[in-house]
Amino acid sequence: MNHQKERMQMTDASVVSGALSASAEWAAVDWRLVERQVRRLQARIAQAEKTGKAGKVKALQRILAHSFSAKLWATRRVVVNKGRRSPGVDGVLWKTPEEKWIAARSLRARGYRPRPLRRIYIPKKNGKLRPLSIPTMTDRAMQALYLLALNPVAEVRADPNSYGFRPYRSTADALGQCFCVFAKKCSPKVVFDADIKACFDRISHPWLLANVPMDKAILRKWLAAGYVEATVLYPTEEGTPQGGIISPVLANLTLDGLERVAHEAAPGRSLVNVVRYADDFLVTARTPEILNEKVIPAIKTFLAERGLEISEEKSKVTDIETGFDFLGATIRKYDGKLLMTPSRKSVKGFLDSIRGTIKAHAGGAFRELTRLLNPRIRGWANYYRNIVSSRVFTKVDSAIFDAMVRWMRRRHPRKGLSWLRTRYFRSSGHRHWIITAATWKADSSVSYTDLFQASSVPIRRHVKVQAAATAFDPAFRDYFRKLRKTRTQTKAADHTGSFQASAAARRSRQHQPGRVTAASGKA
């Protein structure tokens, strides 16, 4: 009776008001109420899973998956994310409010048949191509809907030190845990840097169907949907499709338990730690023998049960004094002191990409090149802002500066340094040779766009999430509220500092008469 009452509460039209057109209905949705209703039931699912009430978990999941609030929330996720402009095999996109409302109303399990995924290939950093499978909008929304019901269970079951594709967790948290593991004098000396061979493509379908706590009929249809490449339909007999909304959580559920297996293989003072981000993980121990004879064999057995295996070519046992790369960072101890820096591979890949963009923009406007580079430099620097990166940032700035100067000289082979300085540079306080692009406005004023410098990003220690904290557990509600506030304040402080620096730069530029002549045109 209580479940029936909850179903009525979750599926009524309280999130909108009155009898309106489809477009008006979508515009009238109270999204705060929708989110509150969904989050409330997700918390109950997490609590039921935490206390081992499997029957209640299943009943609450069904209520959530059939609720209109969840259908609205799932539809909204699909139409606002960055993949909203990429259609599936049917070529359909939901662009108008009317289409979005009708889509939300049409999401139901009865009679649902997913379409094959559209297979495309995107370039990887190493120049190779990575397959990406794109579901239809309807299939994406259905995955998002059932993910709302699956995620609370996945969070409760998750390994404490799993940091990929989980709420409030990121690579910064994973690297923060690495610091916690290795920074002490009595920290483990030996590391197993592991790589799983084609993890997403090889996960066992029978294992998923037997162990993933969701509607098995729906899951079976997704796994068997296949994909279309060049008008040819290919079956999928293993793996989760890379590109599906629910795929990362399925992969996490597959690998959850690995941390427990590692600890059970070598109990006591073995100094075993596991840090995992999706399918990228490392395991520590006191000696190589503990890893090679106990932990690694146990992990291989664990993975084999799921259709997976360790890549022997890409995995290795090393020590912290030699160092290793993890999530784009080099982690190494020098004379007992732990240093985490951007890896050489990451720095080289980033600079190669920047130089390639500069070279490809040989005939374009300088201001457009600057605007193209700035978000990439800022994003790369922000990724590494939580580790020892200041020296690397300075070197990166120098390399980009040299590449830009070469662009200027190729563009103006007959112009001297004084002319180039007037056209492309400015000074501010003690800083000289700041690369900047000028744009003339309609009122004859000039605006400037400086080339972003990685070294302007302040280095700050990341506030790492507690390993035991799970996002949907009511017991951690206050903790996550404080964590959000702390992280928001840190971002706001950084933004304020950046804004003040920009304002000072603008004031400095106002006192540089005659700095620009025709720099606003195509350089």
Predicted regions and their residues:
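Intrinsically disordered, low-complexity and often Lys/Arg-enriched segments
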Residues: 1-32, 36, 450, 464-523
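Charged boundary/loop elements
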Residues: 23-83, 148-164
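Conserved polymerase palm-domain catalytic core
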Residues: 106, 110, 157-169, 173-323
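Phosphate/adenylate-binding "loop-and-lid" substructures adjacent to NTP/NAD/dNTP-binding pockets
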Residues: 57-126
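Short, solvent-exposed helix-loop connector elements
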Residues: 131, 235-240, 339, 355-369, ...
